[in-house]
Design a protein with these regions (language model features):
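Glycine-rich phosphate-binding loop
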Residues: 1
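C-terminal catalytic domains of large/alpha subunits in multi-subunit enzymes
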Residues: 4-144
């Protein structure tokens, strides 16, 4: 099927964030990992579909694809430390920060990978079907 031929695979991931002083580094790292996983899901997998009456068609885990552990690479996470001056602990928020840059980074990587085929745009999520369609459309434009 298309999923095998047009498989997208994230093979490496590095992130660096500034959360000020880290009160509990293990919890912060978990938040970053969760955010990255969420961003990968948004960019490559998670796709809601509705029927003509507005009924959600992807309402179960059988129909709505989310990342599993085997969809994700190991994450390399680093931190800079610029303490916040607005609170006594010098901390900043870290909840799901990894989800901010993940989708555009992945979509740009997909477009870069497909650029030799003439693909210049890709909407999220970059499912195998959307990758196939983008390739077909770029090839039909090139043939004109």
């Amino acid at each position: 099927g298309l999923g095998d031929v047009y498989k997208r695979q994230v093979v490496d991931w590095a992130a660096c964030d500034d959360f000020g002083n880290l009160v509990n580094p293990m919890i912060v790292e978990g938040q970053v990992h969760g955010g990255i996983a969420q961003g990968i899901g948004q960019a490559l997998l998670e796709d809601a579909h509705y029927d003509e009456n507005g009924q959600l068609l992807t309402a179960s885990y059988m129909d709505y694809c989310m990342p599993r552990a085997d969809d994700l690479p190991s994450f390399k996470v680093g931190y800079t430390n610029t303490p916040c001056t607005h609170n006594d602990l010098g901390v900043k928020g870290c909840g799901e920060a990894g989800a901010i840059a993940s989708p555009p980074a992945l979509i740009n990587a997909v477009i870069d990978a497909l650029s030799p085929l003439g693909v210049t745009d890709m909407s999220m999520p970059a499912t195998p079907q959307k990758v196939w369609k983008a390739i077909q459309e770029s090839q039909s434009v090139a043939a004109e």
